[in-house]
Amino acid sequence: YLYFAHHKGAFIRLAYADDLKGPWHIYSPGVLDVSESLFAPTDPPEPPPDQRPSWADTLPGGYLYAHVASPDVHIDESGKRIRMYYHGLLDDGDQKTRVAYSQDGLSFVPQTPLLGPPYFRVIRYKEWLYATTWQGRFLRARDWDGPFEVQRDPGPAMRLFGPDSPLEPRHPALWLKGDTLHLFFSCVGDCPEQIYHCQCELGDDWDSWVFTKPRILLSPEKGWEGSDLPHKASVLGTATS
């Protein structure tokens, strides 16, 4: 099973195959419809200026769309179920992450608690679960269901992405190999958008983690990757052509 999302999707997409090499097929109904997600099921009205989420001030508009996105899926072997972190829209226009569970990978039951910012990517290291989120901030918890505590500033990732950095991460991904945590991410404002990589050696004190200098791992080369499109700085929101 491969779970993915449309930026303005009304449900989580699912592709399936008998082999990683394919052929892959789309499960057309999708899973976890926005109407069942516990997030706003329809586009809410614009809130008063003093109630807008702080990040929305950087957008020209159009951020108030009901959606579910950014699935991060983990197999719970002992519980024989699938755990999926996902985010959606609150009535005040902010976006947050929840977790949902499924016994078959098709029907998911969302949990009520809000766990943190959008774009959760979670790994387990020793006794802790660590999550990176939009803007590169790290959180941690003892349990998959939270609660997650936010790392105090300037944490190791925020030293990469703080006010003095030209990098503004958009979509993160984590890969843990032994004690080495690999962080992959794209950046808002890139022209064109690229995939960066950096890594750090983990220890028990997450405030002592130090990431290497990010380097560009992938840039658009093929037409289907967007290499033939006009070079324009990326912005927050959906991509249009």
Where are these regions (language model features)?
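Beta-rich carbohydrate-recognition and catalytic domains
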Residues: 1-70, 74-170, 175-241
